[in-house]
């Protein structure tokens, strides 16, 4: 493979990776707040307007699907508790460390 072909391949791969990290349903999404298990995680939406509780499709190769959309920490913690996602102490610590409202993230 020539240097030019290799350079183009690297650029293409970098572009694909950047795109994958911007897609909320991707395993590579870059704004994951906490992953409480193999099948559940909390992310910050791409626009930074809300937290989303996502569940991995039953096929482990499947995408992440949104289950709940929340803007307040208290509602997020309550929803996670209802779904049984607070059994991991590390998840609890991360969620309680979030600001009371998602809009406060932009102010930090």
Roles of regions detected by a PLM:
Residues 85-92:
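Intrinsically disordered, low-complexity, charge-dense segments enriched in Lys/Arg
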Residues 46-66:
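Short beta-strand segments and strand-loop junctions that repeat across beta-rich extracellular domains
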Residues 62-79:
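A short, exposed loop/beta-hairpin motif centered on an aromatic-Gly-Thr core
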